[in-house]
Amino acid sequence: VHPDSSLHCVDGRWLLALYCVIPLSFIVVALDTLVLQRTLLHGLLPDDPNDWALWALLFGLPHIIASALTLSDRDYLRHYRWRLLPASLVFLLVCLAGWYGPQPLSYQLLFVFFAGFTVFHVLSQQLGIALVLSGRRPGRLFRLWKWAAIFAGMAIYLMVYGGQYLGRVQLAGIDGYRLFALLAGCFCAALILLTWQLARDCEERLGRWFIWANGLLLISAFAINELGYTLLVILMPRLIHDLTAFSVYITHDRNRQVRTSAGWLYRWLPSNGMTPFVVLPAASILIAWLLNSYQQHAFIGIAILLISFMHYYWEGFVWRGESPLRQHVRFRR
């Protein structure tokens, strides 16, 4: 535990517990296959959890909004302005080109770029936390593990969403989705070996479990997708990633409020540890709901894309080392 008793820590055991969604997903698949004759798959479960109104309200965009609210402090914006401003212009041009360029090619290219950035962001977060909980620096083995996971994740992502956004894909006369499945299988096989080697070298027990949890997340996603349960493939990483992100943002806001000064979101609210726990998710969900309600309008749709790209971008550096934000977040191993 950090020596400052006023500092709240993100509990690594809680983050590891989120991965229980993996065995629970296999239990659902087993029950549906062996007992219910796939009634859930063919009759009750949608292909995408976003078809559930409550899920669409709580997951996806809200954690991106929460990240923006946490970063929108005046001191942080002043500190990072020369990294954020040029990037925002570049990503705005990417969004406009994808939205208004020659169709369907422009939107398909935008999808591939978005898919790659999404997978890179999600896995960089989860694998980075594995590194923190392991108490080690990123070496050659970790980098191999990370990129095997990213390539596996990208292939799985294209298998899940490609039909919706790309349509039929043929590569050198070969069905593209069969090729994606082959690539995902090969990278998952490599991931098993790399995960075993990385976990073996880890001295921290919690870090070792977290390394295995992340390796198994991708392997499980590939296996469950091959069984046809697309909903669970989307649900597992989304639930883990979003709840992990909210845990970090709430911890940051609480510690900053208690130790230094409250951000603009909390300035007129009671100064106690529970305020960010309630206010940040509530404000994020409300703003995300408003944006999603009007996303059919080009301006709102582009705004959602832009803030998503910017979220992926700034999350790559604002929590590294002893950055201004990272000073308010510690992990308990």
What annotation goes with each model-predicted range?
Residues 1-59, 306, 316-317:
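N-terminal signal-anchor module of multipass membrane proteins
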Residues 13-30, 86-94, 148-154, 282:
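Alpha-helical transmembrane segments
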Residues 31-36, 124-128, 152-170, 194-198, ...:
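C-terminal ends of transmembrane alpha-helices
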Residues 76, 80, 97-178:
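Membrane-interface helix-loop-helix junctions at boundaries between adjacent transmembrane segments
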Residues 127-131, 236-259:
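Predominantly late transmembrane helices and immediately cytosolic-facing juxtamembrane segments
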